[in-house]
Amino acid sequence: MTIYKIKYIPDIEEDYYLFLNDAIEAGKNYIDKIAMEEKDGWDSATITYAKNCLNDTLEFKGVVKIKAVNVHTHKGELK
């Protein structure tokens, strides 16, 4: 079974999603959050570029990264 790990790089946090689309959507929301928290903010072109990179490569330059992780179950437990 494959799940998707998303790593929020500036915050060093991780979340896991069963579906890739959910992980990408979470990454886009995080990009919006980071863009607003930046001192001068990001312009709309930068935000669009970041989200397109996330869609195409599953990561954006040290901000967010999505990775497929294979997990195996054993007696109802994830390993």
Regions found by a protein language model. Name each.
Residues 32-79:
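Short, mixed-charge low-complexity intrinsically disordered segments
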Residues 17-21:
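Conserved aromatic
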Residues 13-14, 39:
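Intrinsically disordered regions, especially transient/low-confidence alpha-helical propensity segments
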Residues 1-13:
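Short aromatic-glycine-(Arg/Gly/Cys) micro-motifs in beta-strand/loop hairpins
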Residues 23-26:
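Short amphipathic alpha-helices within nucleic acid-binding modules
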